[in-house]
């Protein structure tokens, strides 16, 4: 079955007032639990805010941070992109921010 990355940008939740964060957290945890119960959850979580990231490109090391950094993500194991989009919509409502959906391309040399 295909796996899909569902992610949001690092500052996508900056518009949410601090007093609303407990409700957002609870809603997000409810969607995670729903995905676990449905057997589609692979893993997920938030990423630390970028400070001085290092990115290696063509052997060159460059200091970050970069505005397009991922702030949070999850991976779901579902039969289709349409199903992944349904989960992304649930996450978007819970997190109050847009989500990006991308299919993982398996590496046939390692058997995943």
Residue ranges of model-derived segments:
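Conserved, structured core segments of small domains
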Residues: 1-112
């Amino acid at each position: 079955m295909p796996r899909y990355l569902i992610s949001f940008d690092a500052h996508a939740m900056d518009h949410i007032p601090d007093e609303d964060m407990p409700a957002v957290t609870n809603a997000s945890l409810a969607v995670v639990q729903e995905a676990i119960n449905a057997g589609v959850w692979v893993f997920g979580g938030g990423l630390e805010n970028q400070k001085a990231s290092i990115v290696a490109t063509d052997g060159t090391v460059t200091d970050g941070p970069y505005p397009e950094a991922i702030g949070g993500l999850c991976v779901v194991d579902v039969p289709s992109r349409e199903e992944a989009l349904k989960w992304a919509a649930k996450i978007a409502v819970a997190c109050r921010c847009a989500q990006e959906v991308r299919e993982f391309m398996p590496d046939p040399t390692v058997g995943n």
